[in-house]
Design a protein with these regions (language model features):
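Pocket-edge structural micro-motifs
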Residues: 9, 63, 81-83
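Short, low-complexity, polar/charged sequence segments that are solvent-exposed and flexible
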Residues: 25-26, 59-61, 72, 97-99
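DPxDG-like acidic metal-binding loop motif
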Residues: 2-60
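Short helix-loop capping/hinge motifs at secondary-structure junctions, enriched
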Residues: 35, 58-61, 65-68, 86-88
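Short, surface-exposed linear patches
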Residues: 27-30, 61-66, 74-76
Length: 99
């Protein structure tokens, strides 16, 4: 078909396990040949929110359009990470993703 579904049934497993509301069910559709994501949906049940985006049509929280911040400086920005929980990876290896 040229497409594949990518599903994370509990995106934010650690938050879910600790009863923190920031977890969700993530689903994406990727065009295989170009590895281009064409749509994505994240359902956040604890907050009763649904985020979705379609390539070329924008991103939404429920039905409200959302966009990335227009912040121009790092000092005014908020950065978050999602390091894997494999204790065999050293910090140096993980930090190569952010250089």
């Amino acid at each position: 078909s040229g497409y594949r579904w990518i599903i994370d049934p509990i995106d934010g497993t650690t938050n879910f396990a600790h009863k923190l509301p920031l977890y969700g069910v993530s689903v994406a559709l990727e065009q295989i040949e170009t590895k281009t994501p064409v749509l994505g949906i994240v359902l956040v049940p604890a907050l009763n929110q649904c985020y979705h985006a379609i390539l070329g049509e924008g991103a939404f929280c429920d039905k409200k359009p959302i966009k990335v911040s227009q912040t121009q400086t790092m000092k005014d920005s908020l950065f978050t990470t999602g390091f894997p929980y494999d204790r065999n990876n050293s910090l140096d290896v993980l930090l190569t993703y952010y250089k």
